[in-house]
């Protein structure tokens, strides 16, 4: 059996561009958020996406208890916010750095996000160090900004919507 080592896997994954997202929650366990690129569509019937979350992350217990989350997809220019939510900054400072609305699930929804998916966690599957959170989408909010933000080759890149 050929086992791929961790560094080879990580180097190869850096070749896969992905949207940059801030995942937020609020509920009985408190308010929390983190930056994630491990987010993708599962199905449109019913509308479902998935988010991967390391069980060793400081935010894991909060998301695990609240069972709701909002995927806030960032637009170009929001790199500092991504870095803030991706570090060890206290939660109150993370949330103070942007404007938020409360979504239908009670989760913080970033006002200037490219798109926000307000969700309830419907299923959790554990694989290795991570939980895969399957999220039933209850509401979607889109912003008119024409620029997206992706993480590719270990750095941020802006994308522009084509003119119609």
From Swiss-Prot:
Induction: Up-regulated by the nitrogen regulatory protein C (NtrC also called GlnG) and repressed by RutR. It is an enzyme of class 1 (oxidoreductase). One of its GO terms (biological process) is nitrogen utilization. Gene3D superfamilies: Electron Transport, Fmn-binding Protein, Chain A. One of its GO terms (molecular function) is riboflavin reductase (NADPH) activity. Keywords: Flavoprotein, FMN, NAD, Oxidoreductase. Its EC number is 1.5.1.42. InterPro entries: Flavin_Rdtase-like_dom, NADH-dep_flavin_reductase, RutF, Split_barrel_FMN-bd. It catalyses: FMNH2 + NAD(+) = FMN + NADH + 2 H(+). PANTHER family: FLAVIN REDUCTASE, FMN REDUCTASE (NADH) RUTF. Catalyzes the reduction of FMN to FMNH2 which is used to reduce pyrimidine by RutA via the Rut pathway. Belongs to the non-flavoprotein flavin reductase family. RutF subfamily. This is FMN reductase (NADH) RutF. It comes from Escherichia coli O139:H28 (strain E24377A / ETEC).
């Amino acid at each position: 059996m050929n086992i791929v080592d961790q560094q080879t896997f990580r180097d190869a994954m850096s070749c896969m561009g992905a949207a940059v997202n801030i995942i937020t929650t609020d509920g009985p366990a408190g308010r929390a958020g983190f930056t994630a690129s491990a987010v993708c569509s599962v199905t449109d019937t019913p509308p479902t996406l998935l988010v991967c979350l390391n069980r060793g992350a400081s935010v894991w217990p909060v998301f695990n208890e609240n069972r709701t989350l909002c995927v806030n997809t960032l637009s170009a220019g929001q790199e500092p916010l991504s870095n803030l939510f991706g570090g060890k900054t206290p939660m109150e400072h993370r949330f103070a750095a942007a404007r938020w609305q409360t979504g239908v699930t009670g989760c913080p929804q970033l006002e200037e996000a490219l798109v926000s998916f307000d969700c309830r966690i419907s299923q959790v599957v554990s694989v290795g160090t991570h939980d895969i959170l399957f999220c039933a989408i209850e509401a979607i909010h889109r912003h008119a900004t024409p620029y997206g933000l992706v993480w590719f080759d270990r750095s941020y890149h802006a994308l522009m919507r084509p003119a119609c």
